[in-house]
């Protein structure tokens, strides 16, 4: 499940261990108020995927360092980490689609880390990323540059890389990784996934049947905090001041 996997091999000798079996967790819906901040915490060793407050979530860590994944109200999640190995997690949907994702929050890595829309497909088996922000390492730099796509107020460089006999959602397999990496970093805005899918197809980068699609925080040998929420159409209500993101489940 990890993006640093192939591309960080160009920068280090680290080999990530990904795609291990998950235990399921169906978290109860929690009514959150400003005065009653109830959180469900997942510790560094608790690799899992499931649903929480109407959203799909996935969390994986190799167990290194100190890292805590916290699922909050509605679509919100947060991660705090210090001197970690490798981890990736977030909230979103299952299956993935060409939806327009609105997200926001804060993301402040010290070292290698990034914030991305992250997902998988099967037939073909593809791991994909739309990277919105990153720390000290550009995760696309170890791949083959295919071109660019301009969408959602920015330009993204498109890369492809290959993982050979590496762990995946279907065990040890050989598969490709698709990347769109935003040239001007940001934390917050709209990501029109269909525009990336269309651009990838033009470069011969075809997807299969979608598995999950999350807005993920990932880190590798780094530290930092991340506090993110994800939404789709309901974001417009927040923009008009009718509700806040804490009140909305989309």
UniProtKB/Swiss-Prot annotation:
Its keywords, alphabetically, are: Carbohydrate metabolism, Glycoprotein, Glycosidase, Hydrolase, Polysaccharide degradation, Secreted, Signal, Xylan degradation
Where is the GH11 domain positioned along the sequence? 43-231
Q: Which positions does UniProt annotate with glycan attachment?
A: 31
| Thermal properties | Optimum temperature is 45 degrees Celsius.
Q: Which reaction does it catalyse?
A: Endohydrolysis of (1->4)-beta-D-xylosidic linkages in xylans
Q: Which GO terms describe its molecular function?
A: endo-1,4-beta-xylanase activity
**Does Signal appear among the keywords?**
yes
Query: Which PANTHER family does the record cross-reference, listed alphabetically?
Result: ENDO-1,4-BETA-XYLANASE A-RELATED (PTHR46828:SF2)
Tell me, in a sentence or two, what this protein's role is: Endo-1,4-beta-xylanase involved in the hydrolysis of xylan, a major structural heterogeneous polysaccharide found in plant biomass representing the second most abundant polysaccharide in the biosphere, after cellulose. The most favorable substrate is beechwood xylan.
Q: What is this protein called?
A: Endo-1,4-beta-xylanase G
Q: Which source organism?
A: Verticillium dahliae (Verticillium wilt)
Gene coding for it: xynG
